[in-house]
């Protein structure tokens, strides 16, 4: 009976991976009493095949889940309609509650039938035995056997806890359960006394901003967190996971962040290969509808690097909702996992982000200043201009307030706190992070990210003359035009490098630098163009085109 109950309450099993013998001898440990025999080779190399009873019951429950999701998103309109029609009276609600109760009982019966179908399937019984054994004892052998299954990630045991690093226990500087530290926006109205009357006046606007951010705003900003989209993408995500596990020998892990969210990660270790770049770990931060299963992790993988991918809170196997605080909390535990469990030094870690992933990437760069480098692909400086682009002009004040208070993705501000090498990849046909049309390359917010970074690091170089020269270079629509502008100002790269190295040797590496203070106008122009070209590379593509491996380059440094 205990096993039958486990089958009723157990997670859905999606796939049984092919047996992987790579490095088995090196990773295996003596079998413990709680370890379970491995599955026979005949059961591998296919999706899990449920029996007819389980299959049909699963279909009914999945359909009910979709209907519930549709009802949830349409509930405000349905409530308004029922109220107008007078269906919310007690005489109408009581019979409806009876119908709802009957439906719940029927669904519970379907779940029991599904459990019986699982109980009659030897594959599922073996899986649930391994899962229960792993929850009792997370030995290396049990976890190795569990990794051969792809199932509902909610039942996966936690592999790494945010408090696990010994340096954080009792530390005042580390994150608390309230979350890691974020840069807070300045008050919208400076100098205004924060009296009780002013607070009361602001309350309606604050309530409106909160409701907009937690309903429409969050789902527009992170559509990948919408359940219906995840349901539609499920077959693609399962195929992507199978590729990472079976072909790349990826290892999945669940991390517990300081806010209680569980973060779904995938690690591909290339340190045992002959390629030197395998010693570097690239942590990938996906876009607003990206998942590590099918996202930007493929670029550094093809380039031969070790890779750690993770899903935003609320995406696929990760729990929670993707607000900035939760995003930063998730990124923090991912970096801690890379350092303290995977064994990478911060100097061997590169943060690579695509699009909206630039927020967590720049937060990690700001919070972990010893990391090797940051690569931002198709990212932006600040969310407000992009949010104003897609909303009506009459909503400008509401949109600005909502973003600043609840969805403040201040990438440029965070990036300027990082002292290490940075590379920006600008898509020349980007249709997402341009504020006008894709053809208007000067409206690409990647330009503003570059200018803010250079103005912070080299303020004496990025004066009016240097800024004008860089803007002309950014306006170039082709490589030929770029080279023409570069040669017009007769940029001497050897001279630029010697000037920068001399300054660094005398004053140290910390930014901002005062280099260019006593330099001629032509010298500042040359240096500004040289620095812009070293910090930004163009890629002739739209926003969602995967970055080819040959375009994945480490940032320039002296």
Swiss-Prot record:
SUPFAM superfamilies: alpha/beta-Hydrolases (SSF53474). It is a multi-pass membrane protein. Its EC number is 3.1.-.-, 3.1.1.23. GO terms for biological process: monoacylglycerol catabolic process; phosphatidylserine catabolic process; prostaglandin catabolic process. The active site is at 355 (charge relay system), 430 (charge relay system), 507 (charge relay system). GO terms for cellular component: membrane. The keyword Cytoplasm does not apply. Disulfide bonds: none annotated. It catalyses: 1-heptadecanoyl-2-(5Z,8Z,11Z,14Z-eicosatetraenoyl)-sn-glycero-3-phosphoserine + H2O = 1-heptadecanoyl-sn-glycero-3-phosphoserine + (5Z,8Z,11Z,14Z)-eicosatetraenoate + H(+); 1-hexadecanoyl-2-(9Z-octadecenoyl)-sn-glycero-3-phospho-L-serine + H2O = 1-hexadecanoyl-sn-glycero-3-phospho-L-serine + (9Z)-octadecenoate + H(+); 1-octadecanoyl-2-(9Z,12Z-octadecadienoyl)-sn-glycero-3-phosphoserine + H2O = 1-octadecanoyl-sn-glycero-3-phosphoserine + (9Z,12Z)-octadecadienoate + H(+); 1-heptadecanoyl-2-(5Z,8Z,11Z,14Z-eicosatetraenoyl)-sn-glycero-3-phosphocholine + H2O = 1-heptadecanoyl-sn-glycero-3-phosphocholine + (5Z,8Z,11Z,14Z)-eicosatetraenoate + H(+). It is an enzyme of class 3 (hydrolase). Residues 114-558 are cytoplasmic. Belongs to the AB hydrolase superfamily. ABHD16 family. This is Phosphatidylserine lipase ABHD16A. It comes from Rattus norvegicus (Rat).
């Amino acid at each position: 009976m205990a096993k039958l109950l486990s089958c009723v309450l157990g997670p859905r099993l999606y796939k049984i991976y092919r047996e992987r013998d790579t490095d088995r001898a090196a990773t295996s440990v003596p079998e413990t009493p709680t370890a379970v025999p491995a599955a026979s080779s005949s059961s591998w190399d296919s999706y899990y095949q449920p029996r007819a009873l389980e299959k049909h019951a699963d279909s009914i429950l999945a359909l009910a889940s979709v209907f519930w999701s549709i009802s949830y998103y349409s509930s405000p309109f349905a409530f308004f309609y029922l109220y107008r029609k007078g269906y919310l009276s007690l005489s109408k609600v009581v019979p409806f509650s009876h119908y709802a109760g009957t439906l719940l009982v029927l669904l519970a019966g379907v779940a029991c039938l599904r459990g019986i179908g699982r109980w009659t399937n030897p594959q599922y019984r073996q899986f649930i035995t391994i899962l229960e054994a792993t929850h009792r004892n997370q030995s290396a052998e049990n976890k190795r056997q569990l990794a051969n299954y792809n199932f509902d990630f909610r039942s996966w045991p936690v592999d790494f806890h945010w408090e696990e690093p010994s340096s954080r226990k009792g530390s005042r500087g580390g994150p608390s359960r309230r979350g890691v530290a974020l840069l807070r926006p300045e008050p919208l109205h400076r100098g205004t006394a924060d009296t009780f009357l002013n607070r009361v006046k602001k309350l309606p606007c604050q309530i409106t901003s909160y409701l907009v951010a937690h309903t429409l705003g969050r789902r527009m900003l992170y559509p990948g967190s919408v359940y219906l989209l995840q349901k539609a993408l499920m077959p693609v995500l399962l195929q992507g996971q199978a590729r990472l596990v079976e072909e790349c020998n990826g290892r999945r892990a669940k991390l517990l962040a300081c806010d209680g969210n569980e973060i779904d990660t995938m690690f591909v270790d290339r340190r045992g290969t002959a390629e030197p770049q395998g010693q570097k770990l690239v942590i990938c931060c996906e876009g607003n509808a990206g998942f590590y299963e099918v996202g930007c992790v493929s670029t550094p993988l093809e380039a031969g690097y070790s890779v750690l991918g993770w899903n935003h809170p609320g995406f696929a196997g990760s729990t929670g909702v993707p607000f900035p605080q939760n995003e930063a909390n998730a990124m923090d535990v991912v970096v801690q996992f890379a350092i303290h469990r995977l064994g990478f030094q911060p100097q061997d870690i590169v943060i690579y982000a695509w699009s909206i992933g630039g927020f967590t990437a720049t937060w990690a760069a700001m919070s972990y200043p010893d990391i090797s480098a940051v690569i931002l692909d198709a990212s932006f400086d600040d969310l407000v201009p992009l949010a104003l682009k897609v909303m009506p002009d009459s909503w400008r004040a509401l949109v600005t307030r909502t973003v600043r208070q609840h969805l403040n993705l201040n990438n440029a501000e965070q990036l300027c706190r990082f002292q290490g090498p940075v590379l920006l990849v600008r898509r020349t046909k980007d249709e997402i992070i341009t504020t006008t049309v894709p053809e208007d390359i000067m409206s690409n917010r990647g330009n503003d990210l570059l200018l803010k970074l250079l103005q912070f690091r080299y303020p004496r170089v990025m004066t009016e003359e240097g800024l004008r020269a860089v803007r002309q270079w950014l306006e170039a629509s082709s490589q030929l035009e770029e080279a023409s502008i570069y040669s017009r100002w007769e940029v001497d790269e050897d001279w630029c490098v010697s000037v920068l190295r001399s300054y660094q040797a005398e004053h140290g590496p910390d930014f901002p630098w005062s280099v260019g203070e006593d330099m001629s106008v032509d010298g500042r122009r040359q240096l500004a163009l040289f620095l812009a070209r070293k910090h930004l590379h163009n890629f002739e593509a739209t926003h969602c085109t995967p970055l080819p491996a040959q375009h994945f380059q480490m940032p320039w440094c002296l």
